[in-house]
Amino acid sequence: LPRYKCIPWEYQETMEYKGSFYMDLCSDGRQYYVGIMEYQEDGVIYDFIDNEEFFSWGNPYTNLIDDIPKFCYFSKAALAALNYLDWVPDVVHCHDWQAALVPLYLRTCFADTNVGRASAVLTIHNLKFQGIYDRKMIQYWSGLPDYVFNKDCLTQNWLDANMLKGGITYCNRLTTVSNTYAGEIQTEEYGEGLAEHLRYHQNKNRRIVNGIDINIWKPSTDKLLKANYYSKTEIENKKKNKKALQESLG
């Protein structure tokens, strides 16, 4: 995760420094600092990439001209951090255009490293946002080899590059957030200019529905509820749960 400045200090002050290094990023070999900070909550370890130049100002999403360099840096730094920590995942799960360069980095810049053995899954939440910008700018900031900037991968309309399109090309599996959305984005009406590309890569597509496991979060058996209920019409027990939640939140 990026260590954004907007993360509440109560979490940041408990982060533990795990190491740092410098990484080549741009096509001219310019180097950037990569710090690794670790945070633990309920037995889960979260690793944060620390770099004040990219993450110390603004919100997670600002404007495209600033977000392109930021997410080129983050995508490459996250993989470099895994190598630094000597931790090789079986699968790297990327979300939307912001992390769509990860599959390309895995198969190019990191192909001969330990993390290069990982498979890449790319999830599309909203196809409308694709990370499209001037090809020369994305080529410079990503430092990716020239051969990935072609019409079947990153290039769009010759002058632009499309980061999400490149991720679709290089990922091992592509997932969407519903069964219907997977089909819709392959149509000209909802494909946002990528319908043909998505149809070409449809063999990668797996459909994972957003939502909850109703066998776990079941009102009649959920032990976390103050009062269980079996029907939508059992208002009294719902009121008890509402009151318990309000009391727990002060």
For the regions a language model picked out, list residue spans one by one:
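Catalytic cores of nucleotide-sugar-dependent glycosyltransferases that transfer UDP/GDP/TDP-activated
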Residues: 1-250
